[in-house]
C-alpha cells in the first residue's frame, strides 16, 4: 500500500475479486479456488467474507500494541472497514442480535470493531492524546432495505432524502465523530460543513508541518482544526 510502512488489506471492495488478504503487498495465500461474494472470482481457500471484520480488528490491535512500545513516537492507523458495505455478511455471533435483519446485525458488529480498537488504546494508556475519527465515505445504500429499516424505527440516513449513489443529501452527508480527550471537549457539536478531503490539511495543521508543504499541495483541503477546538471557522 503506497504511503504506508505496513499494511493488511484486501485488493478492492469485498464484493470484488480476487478474494485474498495482502499483508505488506504480498498475498497471505494464493487464489486457487472460486468463491462468490456477489461476484464470482478467484479466492484464497481460507478467505471468507464473514471473517474480515474479525481479522482487520486483530491486525489493528496488534499494530496499536506494537506502536505503544515505541513510547513518544506518534503513529497513524487507517482502518477502512468492509462493513456496512455489501455484501452484508455479519459474523455468526452477531446474526439475529439487532432485531433489524442482517444490516442491523452488521452495524452491531461494526460497533464492536470500534469498541475493540478503543480498548486497545485504553490498555496501552494512549487515550488522552490520541485522535480517533469515525466517519464514512457515503450514505447508506439501498441494499440495506432502507424502507424496512425505517418501519422498524431505524433511519440509516437520518431525515435526509436519498441514499448512496444518488444526488440527494442522504447519499452524501455522513457521520463524523472525533474523540481526542486532550483537545476536544466530549459531547460538543459543530455545525461547520466539512469534507473528507479536509482531513489532509487538518492533520497537517495538527502536526505543525504546514510550512513544509508545497504551495500547490492539497489545494482542495481546508483545516477544520479550529472547529475541533471549539473555535470559529478560521477559513
Pin down the residues of each PLM region.
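C-terminal cap/loop subdomain of S1 sulfatases and analogous C-terminal strand-loop tails that border
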Residues: 5-14, 140-146, 150-167, 183-188, ...
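Solvent-exposed, acidic/flexible segments
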Residues: 46-57, 100-103, 107-110, 153, ...
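Beta-strand elements within well-structured catalytic alpha/beta cores of enzymes
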Residues: 74-80, 107-110, 114, 131-136, ...
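Histidine-centered active-site microenvironments of extracellular/periplasmic hydrolases
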Residues: 1-2, 87-90, 96-102, 106, ...
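Structured segments of extracytoplasmic/periplasmic soluble domains
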Residues: 10, 63-70, 97, 113, ...
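A long, amphipathic alpha-helix that forms part
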Residues: 51-68, 92-130
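Solvent-exposed loop/turn segments at secondary-structure junctions
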Residues: 13-16, 27-28, 82-86, 112, ...
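Formylglycine-dependent
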Residues: 1-73, 81-92
Amino acid at each position: 500500500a503506497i504511503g504506508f510502512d505496513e499494511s493488511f488489506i484486501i485488493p478492492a471492495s469485498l464484493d470484488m475479486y480476487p478474494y485474498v488478504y495482502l499483508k505488506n503487498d504480498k498475498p497471505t495465500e494464493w487464489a486457487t479456488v472460486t468463491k462468490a461474494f456477489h461476484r464470482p472470482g478467484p479466492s484464497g481457500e481460507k478467505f471468507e467474507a464473514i471473517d474480515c471484520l474479525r481479522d482487520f480488528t486483530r491486525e489493528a490491535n496488534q499494530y496499536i500494541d506494537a506502536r505503544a512500545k515505541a513510547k513518544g513516537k506518534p503513529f497513524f492507523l487507517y482502518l477502512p472497514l468492509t462493513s456496512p458495505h455489501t455484501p452484508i455478511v455479519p459474523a455468526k455471533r452477531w446474526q439475529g442480535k439487532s432485531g433489524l435483519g442482517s444490516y442491523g446485525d452488521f452495524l452491531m458488529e461494526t460497533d464492536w470493531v470500534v469498541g475493540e480498537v478503543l480498548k486497545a488504546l485504553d490498555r496501552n494508556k494512549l487515550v488522552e492524546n490520541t485522535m480517533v475519527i469515525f466517519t464514512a465515505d457515503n450514505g447508506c445504500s439501498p441494499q440495506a432495505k432502507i424502507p424496512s429499516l425505517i418501519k422498524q424505527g431505524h433511519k440509516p440516513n437520518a431525515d435526509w432524502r436519498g441514499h448512496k449513489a444518488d444526488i440527494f443529501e442522504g447519499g452524501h452527508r455522513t457521520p463524523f465523530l472525533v474523540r481526542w480527550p486532550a483537545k476536544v471537549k466530549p459531547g460538543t457539536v459543530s455545525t461547520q460543513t466539512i469534507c473528507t478531503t479536509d482531513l489532509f490539511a487538518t492533520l497537517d495543521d495538527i502536526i505543525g508541518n504546514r510550512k513544509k508543504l508545497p504551495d500547490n499541495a492539497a489545494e482542495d483541503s481546508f483545516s477544520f482544526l479550529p472547529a475541533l477546538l471549539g473555535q470559529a471557522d478560521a477559513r
